[in-house]
Amino acid sequence: QEEALKAYVASALPRSTRQIGAFIEREFGVIYESRAGLIALLHRLGLEYHKPEVVGRKLDAEKQQAFIEGYEKLRNALGPDEAVLFLDAVHPTHAARPVGCWAPKEEKLAIEQTSGRQRINIHGAIDLETGQTRMIEAETIDAASTIRLLEALEALYPFLAMIHVYLDNARYHHAKLVQEWLAQPGRRIKLHFIPAYCPHLNPIERLWGVMHKHVTHNKCYATSREFAGEVLSFLREKVPQNWPQLCDSITDNFRVIDPKDFRVLA
């Protein structure tokens, strides 16, 4: 019976213990009155509750490994007059983002719905060594906002000889305007492009998640201006100020994601 149960779970991937309990009752005539008891049985059989990861079809494990090795080589050889930053864009929307939380059993929780769904466009970068950030609010994220951000990074580090910037392969990051700007005499920025479809290799993606946890989850802002102010204040001021507490959540502890290591669901 236990082997049949394991085979059922492996094949059907049921989403709830109720489904599993119904299978056990239907096939073996056994009724589990206690959900905890059923969960204990599943654990004893080597079964766990999983949330599938989202894995890109075009992920290239070899390119990821080469990128990680190249990044580690650069970090290990980094001079005192150099810095490394990670760059990306984010588009927070002025909307309620409810998440689960503990509360008294008798209370019903709610978040006031916002009147609109305006979003803000932020082009930003972070230095993992210091927690320093530069966040540019823009009408659109494009080559112009990229150049504004790169200029802000040079202003942030006026005495460094080289600023290494890691970023994704968005078209505007490769734009002719950006290339022309980089070619100007005296520029001190070198771009390093992260392999395609690999947001897990850009730590600033984790910063966006931390931002939502602290600013948007289970919170309501009366106006889009108030919302934008809180988001930008967190990214520009609170992240550097609280970097010792936040740094463990925003790291360059990279890993290779290979689709071959997963059972990809159809």
Model-found features: residue ranges?
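C-terminal anion-handling pockets and recognition modules
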Residues: 37, 80-82, 204-266
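A short, amphipathic alpha-helix used for macromolecular contacts
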Residues: 1-34, 78
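Extended, low-complexity cationic-aromatic segments
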Residues: 66-151, 252, 257-266
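RNase H-like two-metal-ion nuclease catalytic core shared by retroviral integrases
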Residues: 61, 168-169, 176, 192-216, ...
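Major-groove recognition helix of helix-turn-helix-like DNA-binding domains
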Residues: 33-47
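Acidic, metal-coordinating catalytic cores used for nucleic-acid/nucleotide bond scission
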Residues: 16, 27, 93, 141, ...
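RNase H-like polynucleotidyl transferase catalytic core
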Residues: 108-115, 183-203, 219-220
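Generic structural signal for small/hydrophobic residues in well-ordered secondary structure
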Residues: 5, 20, 38, 88, ...
